[in-house]
């Protein structure tokens, strides 16, 4: 099988897609990335993975595998405390001590 077919299989069968929403620092909430994460992870683990993949460490985060950037322009800040991740129909906010469900 070719790589594109295997990638599509992963996205449909093996992985979930979560949305990363920047709203910290007074930002108007806006989706900055869609991140592919393993389906078998707990929701908070999916949030952790999305957080890690949307932080620039050695390279710009939007160049990471499993990340689809959704922002306009040349760049975007890293995900921070106060930002959110949408997993299925549940939205989580990044707190200083983990993830809290947004009601």
Please give the residue ranges for each predicted region.
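Intrinsically disordered, low-complexity segments enriched in small/polar residues
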Residues: 24, 38, 71-73, 96
């Amino acid at each position: 099988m070719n790589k594109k077919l295997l990638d599509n299989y992963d996205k449909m069968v093996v992985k979930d897609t979560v949305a990363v929403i920047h709203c910290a620092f007074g930002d108007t909430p806006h989706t900055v990335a869609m991140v592919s994460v393993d389906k078998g992870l707990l929701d908070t683990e999916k949030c952790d993975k999305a957080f890690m993949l949307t932080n620039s460490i050695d390279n710009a985060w939007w160049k990471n595998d499993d990340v689809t950037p959704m922002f306009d322009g040349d760049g975007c800040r890293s995900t921070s405390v106060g930002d959110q991740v949408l997993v299925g129909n549940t939205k989580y906010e990044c707190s200083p001590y983990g993830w809290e469900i947004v009601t």
